Regions:
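Short coil-to-beta strand junction motifs in C2/discoidin
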Residues: 270-289
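A short beta-strand micro-motif common to beta-rich folds, especially ectodomain repeats
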Residues: 85-99, 289-293
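N-terminal targeting leaders for non-cytosolic proteins
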Residues: 114-243, 251
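Extracellular/luminal low-complexity segments enriched in Ser/Thr/Pro
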Residues: 73-90
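Beta-strand-rich extracellular modules
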Residues: 13, 79, 94-100
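C-terminal edge beta-strand
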Residues: 23, 100-115
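Solvent-exposed, low-complexity, repeat-rich "mucin-like" stalks and linkers
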Residues: 4-6, 16, 23-63, 112-113
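Extended extracellular/luminal ectodomain segments enriched in beta-structured repeat modules
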Residues: 251-258, 286
Length: 293
């Protein structure tokens, strides 16, 4: 292999050779590009991060949608949607780098009459005072992952949360072992992350096995906060009582369109190494996620 400033020359054992042009590293990032569910007539602006790009052009916009692309951002407006209708389609952007092959960026857009997002980020908190008297999500993160005062209270205060005035989703600890504590299951707000599988145990039960490369946080798309589910039904002897669940606190039926899920460090360690209750996952094993509404 011979490399110069512009090409890579590859010579095979039989003497055959071919030349590959050298490309230049380039960047075309759309911030929050996974958030593509819109409410009727909603306009959303996505900030762009670019480097070594000659041109970026919108080459496909779904019918009824509008989109404007410039050097700094992408602005998308959804069509009008009524009733239970759904307007969806694929938006495409042709990106032409300075010294590399171009590529097509795709975004799957979807619009419904009304959409709300539960992010667990403090800036998105819209409810009244929570169980500890604060108007944010972070105050619901326990100071200890196991045995903390919020999830394992010494008084009768029941751990609960509600996304009032937004998605209206809510949850509280079930009576798993008769005492409404997290060892009986529940949905706990967290911002813990841990990439060390030797910490994959109940002492680190609120940590996710994921860290965003840009923000250093453990939530989806680089966000800081998230919700940790704990609770199961099997014959191990360690499951008892009702399973935890999330519901609409105002009693109105709605559709949960999607959610983003990752493994906790506890689960990742069980899959990789096993523990006292389960063997490590083999090549023919699988992990199945089922959501019932």
């Amino acid at each position: 292999v011979t490399v110069n400033d512009n090409h890579v020359l590859v010579t095979l054992a039989d003497g055959t050779s071919f030349t590959l042009p050298k490309g230049e590293t380039y960047t075309f990032d759309i911030a929050n590009r996974d958030y593509t569910l819109f409410s009727s007539n909603e306009t959303r602006t996505y900030l762009l991060t670019t480097a070594n790009i000659d041109d970026a052009t919108l080459i496909a916009i779904p019918q009824g949608w509008t989109a404007v692309l410039n050097d700094k951002d992408l602005r998308i407006t959804a069509p009008a949607v009524s009733g239970d209708d759904v307007k969806d389609g694929e938006l495409k952007i042709l990106v032409t780098p300075s010294k590399a092959f171009g590529k097509v960026i795709k975004m799957q857009l979807r619009a419904v009459r009304e959409a709300h997002f539960l992010t667990f980020e403090d800036v998105d908190y819209k409810g009244d005072a929570n169980m500890v008297g604060e108007r944010n999500w972070s105050s619901l993160i326990d100071s200890q992952q196991y045995g903390g005062p919020l999830l394992y209270p010494k008084n009768n205060q029941l751990y609960n949360w509600s996304d009032a005035n937004n998605s209206f989703l809510a949850s509280e600890l079930p009576k798993g072992w008769g005492d409404y504590q997290y060892w009986g299951g529940g949905h706990a707000i967290s911002n813990y992350l841990d990439m060390d599988l030797t910490h994959g145990d109940f002492q680190h039960q609120l940590a996710v096995y994921y860290q965003d490369a840009k923000t250093g946080f453990g939530g989806h798309n680089g966000s800081k906060n998230f919700c940790v589910h704990y609770g199961y039904a099997d014959n191990s002897g360690y499951a008892n009582g009702p399973l935890p669940y999330i519901y609409f606190g105002d009693g109105v039926a709605r559709v949960v369109d999607h959610m983003y899920v990752t493994m906790t460090t506890y689960l990742a360690n069980c899959v990789a190494n096993g523990n006292g209750l389960t063997a490590p996952a083999g090549k023919d094993d699988w992990v199945k996620l089922v959501a019932i509404g």
